[in-house]
Amino acid sequence: MIMTQSNDRMSKNDYYLSIAMQVLERSTCLRRQYGAVIVKADEIIATGYNGSPRGMENCSDRGFCYRNLKNIPSGQGYEDVHCSVHAEQNAIISAGRSKCIGATLYLVGYDSSKQESHGWIKEPAPCSICMRMIINAGISKLILGLPEE
């Protein structure tokens, strides 16, 4: 985007959501991709994307999704299936709690089965486990969705 007037400048929320869209490109999940950015005092303190725990084989490397193979519905079975760490979790782990206190978490999601929105999840919602982590980390604000542009 080339600015022609001062009011053409991208908002900070759109800026950080756009970065989260780039972060999700690193996701190794075949089902859905998420990107998270944690910002404090206008500084990015951590990013995260969803994928297998460190050292474990990724679905993208395996060529199949374990959750799909076992017919586990979206939003269920997180406690029983240890094949994924969510974007929000990875970002919080990378930042550490002391940096997260009072921060804002930006989250975007993509699901290729959602054809009506070209795959973008308009209102991605953290799961109950991620919400507990967000609360315990001291994150004070969530910005969910897509940039307005």
Regions found by a protein language model. Give the residues of each.
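Short, Lys/Arg-enriched N-terminal segments with co-localized hydrophobic residues
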Residues: 1-2
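Zn2+-dependent cytidine deaminase-like catalytic core
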Residues: 8-11, 17, 45-149
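Short glycine/serine- and small hydrophobic-enriched flexible loop segments
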Residues: 22-25, 40, 93-96
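Short beta-strand scaffold segments in enzyme catalytic cores
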Residues: 33-48
